[in-house]
Curated annotation (Swiss-Prot):
Protein name listed in UniProt: 3-methyl-2-oxobutanoate hydroxymethyltransferase
Residues that, per the record, bind Mg(2+): D44, D83, E115
Cell location: Cytoplasm
Keyword annotations of the record: Cytoplasm, Magnesium, Metal-binding, Pantothenate biosynthesis, Transferase
Function description: Catalyzes the reversible reaction in which hydroxymethyl group from 5,10-methylenetetrahydrofolate is transferred onto alpha-ketoisovalerate to form ketopantoate.
GO biological process: one example: pantothenate biosynthetic process
Enzyme Commission numbers on file: 2.1.2.11
Source taxon at top rank: Bacteria
Record flagged with keyword RNA-binding: no
Record field: catalytic activity: 3-methyl-2-oxobutanoate + (6R)-5,10-methylene-5,6,7,8-tetrahydrofolate + H2O = 2-dehydropantoate + (6S)-5,6,7,8-tetrahydrofolate
Residue numbers annotated as active site: E182 (proton acceptor)
Pathway(s) it belongs to: Cofactor biosynthesis; (R)-pantothenate biosynthesis; (R)-pantoate from 3-methyl-2-oxobutanoate: step 1/2
Amino acid sequence: MRTTISQLKEMKQNKQKIAMLTAYDYPTAQILDKAGIPAILVGDSLGMVVLGYDSTVSVTMEDMLHHLKAVVRGSQKAMVIADMPFMTYHLSPEQALLNAGRFMQEGGAQAVKLEGGVNVADKVKRIVDCGIPVMGHIGLTPQSVNQLSGFKVQGKTLTAALALLEDARALEKAGAFAIVLETMPAELAAMITAAVSIPTIGIGAGENCDGQVQVVSDMLGMFTDFVPKHTKKYADLNGIISKAVSGYVTEVAKGEFPTLKESFTLDKKVLEELKKCVSSEQ
C-alpha cells in the first residue's frame, strides 16, 4: 500500500515532518522505498542531473515518462509524484489535464506536480476535478529561471512575499494536496505553512515547513561542480565511485581482475576432450 494524500495531511496535523527525495531510476527508487521515504518525486531536475541539460526547460514528456515508469517499478510503498515539464500545462487547462492523465495512465504516477501559483490555479482545478492529485510548487520555479534572472531567492520584498502567500492560497483553493516552497526566506515559508491547511514541502525554505525535499544526487554527493546552499551532503558518492572505478582500471591493467573467483571453469574431462578436438584440427 502506497502513501496516501490523507496520510500526508495527517502528518501535517500531527506535526510529523515529511521526508521526500527525487529518484530517476529503478535501483534508486528501490533504495529510497526500503529506507521508508513516504514520497518520491520524479523531478524534471533529471534534465540537469541525469541528462546533462543546462536547465529543466529542455525536458520533455517522453523524458519524464521513461524515468517515471522505472521509479514506479522500483517502489511499492512511496507515493510517486511526477513533475510536469515546461510547456506541458501552460497553454490551457485541457492541455494540462491530458498530460497529467498520461503520467497516471502510462507512467503509473500517484500524483503530478506543476510550477506556479495564481497563474496556474485554473489548470490545477481542472486536473483535480478529474480525479488526479496535484502538488503545487512556488517560490523559485526552475522552469521560469530565465524570467527570474537566475536561481535567486524569491519573496524578499513585501510585494513579492504577499504574492507568494496569495499563490499558496490560490493553489489550496484550486485543490492542490501539497505545495513545494523553494528558495525563499525561512520566515516567509513559516507564514505560508501556517496560512494553508495542506502540507508544505520545503527546499531551501527553512525548518518550519511540514516537510523537506532534496535532489537525491545532491544529498548523496554525486556532483562536485555545484552544491546548492540548501543541500546537506549525507555521503560522498562521487569520491566513493571515483575510487572504485580507479581501482577497477588498475586491476584490469595489471591482470589482477578477474581472478579464478570471478571466473567459470570447464569440467576437467570436457576440457581434455576439447583440447584433443582442437589439436586434431591443427
